[in-house]
């Protein structure tokens, strides 16, 4: 069975907190939007909001969408309450934690090990996007009240069936280039049906998130490990920011998730937001 449910996810799930409270819905606009509302009403840490189809998922930048046909992807949002664990500037540690947990879960289930593209994508070796992460949070009195990490992973989806996807969802969901030029999925990489992999990947992901979050509570940070997975590490890149374009060599990220760029004059620029182009 490819359709996920709360009972299926909890069955044999080896966690104490993460994924023990679940809402699973067949079709939704955005899992992040729904879980943020629940977070504001007191939903407990580890709460999982899961969907089998997403119609209006949001990307990191305004106007970008994450849209997925039924039962094709892992579409989830996970709630953290890290008030006494990390300060607001380090909220991206939770994004990194989830990205690393997802990489490990994918590798354990399929043998594939994706790379990371700053600031929030999992990509395959050809640079095509495999998963996206969107982190949203609430701060009060300089403390994190809650953090919602949303993830969309392309599991069993053939982007080469372009006309079918365009008719249903529009080009790239954003009016951009054809999806098969920019995105990929586990099924496309492996050359087989991967619908049965959604559940075990999700369960392994939740278990690995819990272990990594326990390490975070003990003071472990993940930016150095995260940096080692970065596409373009040690390579010349261009970063197109909101107000400025930067060029230099990628050094990794700092504890706040900011990109560290060594410029031609050997100075180090810290960049909080932007899109990376790698010059191979």
Please place each PLM-identified region on the residue numbering.
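N-terminal lobe of the biotin/lipoate ligase/transferase fold
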Residues: 1-108, 195
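Conserved active-site carboxylates
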Residues: 121
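Long, positively charged amphipathic alpha-helical accessory segments at protein N-termini or as interdomain linkers
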Residues: 17, 83-114, 124-280
């Amino acid at each position: 069975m490819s359709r996920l449910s709360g009972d299926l996810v909890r069955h044999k799930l080896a966690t104490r907190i993460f994924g023990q409270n679940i809402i699973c819905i067949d079709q939704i606009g955005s899992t992040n939007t729904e879980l943020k509302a629940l977070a504001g009403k007191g939903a407990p840490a580890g709460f999982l909001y899961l969907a089998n189809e997403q119609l209006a998922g949001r990307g990191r930048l305004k106007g970008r969408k994450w849209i997925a046909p039924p039962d094709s992807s892992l579409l989830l949002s996970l709630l953290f309450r890290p008030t006494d664990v990390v300060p607001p500037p380090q909220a991206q540690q939770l994004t990194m934690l989830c990205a690393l947990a997802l990489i490990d879960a994918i590798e354990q289930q399929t043998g594939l090990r994706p790379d990371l593209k700053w600031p929030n994508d999992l990509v395959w070796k050809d640079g095509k996007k495999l998963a996206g992460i969107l982190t949203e949070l609430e701060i009060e009195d300089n403390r994190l009240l809650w953090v919602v990490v949303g993830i969309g992973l392309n599991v069993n989806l053939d982007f080469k069936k372009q006309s079918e996807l365009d008719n249903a969802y529009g080009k790239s969901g954003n009016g951009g280039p054809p999806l098969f030029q920019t995105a990929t999925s586990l099924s496309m990489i492996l050359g087989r049906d991967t619908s049965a992999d959604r559940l075990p990947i999700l369960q392994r992901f939740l278990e690995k998130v819990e272990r990594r979050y326990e390490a975070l509570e003990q003071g472990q940070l993940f930016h150095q490990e995260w940096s080692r997975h970065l596409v373009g590490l040690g390579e010349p890149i261009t970063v197109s920011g909101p107000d400025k374009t930067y060029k230099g060599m990628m050094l990794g990220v700092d504890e706040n998730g900011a990109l560290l760029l060594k410029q031609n004059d050997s100075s180090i620029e810290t960049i909080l937001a932007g899109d990376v182009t790698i010059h191979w």
